[in-house]
């Protein structure tokens, strides 16, 4: 399931992030790549252990965990500390086809997660750069994603994906992973669809409608059946 979420960060938040990031030191992005990914990864990152990256990452987690659509789509158990990257046209930056590591560990906190969902939060407007599309492959084909600054996309970490070469400007984003309470992507997708339908019924019929209450019970019982906590 590929899900886009609008306005995770406001435009003012994005401007503040960019001001802080532009004044920070960057390093070779291959420092956080696995052995396979490192061969095709060409970009820059904020040092993951830096105070800047941690503070900005905490702001992103706070914004996401108060976003109902994110909670409904991800059903998160653990969120890996967000990382930050930059693809510059002047350096020919891109990221070839790869799949994310199954397990990620954080050196500072000791957190280890199974990567169920990958997240990219865009921090540059689409008209600021050419190229830089996130291309995600699944059983239905390839999907190009290039969202407004402040929006994010969630997709299964099992997906092959790439970032096309940036030919003008710079693509700036945050990226990270999460472990969901619902391991299986198909099960998580069905629960999300059910939740979306229930919310639509609540808007039309109210929370006290008997059939809506029954469906809400089914929703919680499915989570109870599938959840790993």
UniProtKB/Swiss-Prot annotation:
The keyword Iron applies. Keywords: Dioxygenase, Iron, Metal-binding, Oxidoreductase, Vitamin C. Residues 78-180 form the Fe2OG dioxygenase domain. Binds 1 Fe(2+) ion per subunit. One of its GO terms (biological process) is DNA damage response. One of its GO terms (molecular function) is 2-oxoglutarate-dependent dioxygenase activity. Pfam families: 2OG-FeII_Oxy_3 (PF13640), PKHD_C (PF18331). PANTHER family: PKHD-TYPE HYDROXYLASE YBIX. NCBIfam families: PRK05467.1-2, PRK05467.1-3, PRK05467.1-4. This is PKHD-type hydroxylase blr3905.
